[in-house]
């Protein structure tokens, strides 16, 4: 009996391979994959939204515990990717600010993600690649993922 592979199997396999490749490349910048995601979120809030970010924002956005966020941020600070500043409005909050090192790493991370996108669509025409993106967004929304979440985007979306 010839069974076709499940769609979720394809998605899982692609996600695993892409995640491993991304992790290896991001590590050359001195970041873990989680730190890379945090870096992008903080960058996005600073650059695109014009807002500051604190640990609580990251906890809520990524749906993870304070202790996890705190550990990641402390390691990022120790590595020179960000600084903390006490909020003038609420002294319990510490705003996160990216350093120049972080901005440089972010630019490299965007390039790495663009390379991954190009690899995913290498055998597709431009129209097929656009349709693939549209279908991925629909599928993501169907399972409760915000398809327009603030993660690095391809060159066409920037």
How should these model regions be labeled?
Residues 1, 49, 127-158:
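C-terminal regulatory/oligomerization modules of transcriptional regulators
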Residues 1-29, 79, 158:
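N-terminal leader segment of winged-helix/HTH proteins
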Residues 6, 10, 17, 21, ...:
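Pre-recognition alpha-helix immediately N-terminal to the DNA-recognition helix
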Residues 15, 40-47, 110, 137:
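Short, locally clustered residues in the helix-turn-helix/winged-helix DNA-binding domain
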Residues 20-68, 151:
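N-terminal helix-turn-helix DNA-binding core of bacterial DNA-binding proteins
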Residues 55, 73-74:
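Short, hydrophobic-biased segments on the C-terminal half of alpha helices
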Residues 74-134:
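Charged, amphipathic alpha-helical coiled-coil/dimerization segments
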